[in-house]
UniProtKB/Swiss-Prot annotation:
Transmembrane segment boundaries: 4-24, 32-52
Stored Pfam families: Pmp3
Family, as annotated: Belongs to the UPF0057 (PMP3) family.
Compartment(s) where it occurs, according to its Swiss-Prot or TrEMBL record: Membrane
GO cellular component: a single term: membrane
Keyword vocabulary terms for this entry: Membrane, Transmembrane, Transmembrane helix
Name the UniProt record assigns to this protein: UPF0057 membrane protein ZK632.10
Topology class, membrane: Multi-pass membrane protein
Amino acid sequence: MCQILLAILAIFLPPIAVLLDVGCNCDLLINILLTCLGIIPGIIHAWYIILCKEKTVVQNIYVQTNDHGTAPPAYSPYSA
């Protein structure tokens, strides 16, 4: 979502702006607690999250193996 719109939304509803920006994580919980302490700390934290904090990129890596070789030797307690 556009950072400018989120920054404006953060003035009125800081936790909602943080939720839309980063999802449900510890930043949202911190913002809710700061907003309960006072609207100004909540707004400042929301602006920091929206405008300054680097976004993490999640990249899923899928590994497919095709093991069609010979099977390893079976364990035998007796020597051959």
